[in-house]
Swiss-Prot record:
Function: Part of the complex catalyzing the transfer of N-acetylglucosamine from UDP-N-acetylglucosamine to phosphatidylinositol, the first step of GPI biosynthesis. Involved in cell wall biosynthesis.
Enzyme class: transferase
Phylogenetic placement of the source organism: Eukaryota, Fungi, Dikarya, Ascomycota, Saccharomycotina
Biological source species: Saccharomyces cerevisiae (strain ATCC 204508 / S288c) (Baker's yeast)
Cytoplasmic side: 1-12, 74-140
Name of the protein in its database record: Phosphatidylinositol N-acetylglucosaminyltransferase subunit GPI19
Length: 140
């Protein structure tokens, strides 16, 4: 029943302990091996890779992560972001635009009345209503 939780917890513990052990192994000075018993040091040297390889692999992984983050940022900005003149930057796919050819009919019928959430005004019409027309149309 709880096998996934145990799996993820054990994976987290193994990865975290490996990371901590690798960082400690790469930071420890070489003179520390002289104070410890030779049997223990020889066993560790057989298990762990050389210190130069650990630092090299850490550097390669860090540069790989940096390139991945920069690549994802560029992909998001170039591919996933819609252009500024696209209608999807203002409305969503569920929006229904009100289109009237005559501006006076549009103003009288749609501009200053509630849309009840069924129709959306286009961006140009909203800008015209806010900044171009006088407040004289509000009395009609």
């Amino acid at each position: 029943m709880y096998t996934k939780e145990y799996y993820w917890f054990s994976q987290y513990m193994i990865i975290t302990s490996t990371l901590v052990l690798t960082i400690i192994w790469s930071i420890l000075p070489s003179s520390l091996g002289e104070a410890a018993p030779k049997q223990f040091i020889n066993t560790l040297l057989d298990i762990f890779p050389q210190r130069r390889w650990i630092i090299t692999l850490e550097s390669i992984m860090l540069m790989g992560m940096l390139c991945t983050y920069i690549g994802l940022l560029m992909y998001n900005e170039d591919t996933l972001t819609p252009p500024l003149d696209s209608l999807s930057t203002v409305t969503d796919a569920g929006g229904q635009l009100v289109i009237e050819d005559d501006p006076d009919v549009f103003v009288k019928k749609w501009a200053f009345k509630e849309t009840s959430g069924i129709y959306d005004l286009s961006l140009m019409d909203a800008c015209q209503l806010l900044y171009l027309y006088d407040n004289d149309h509000t009395s009609t």
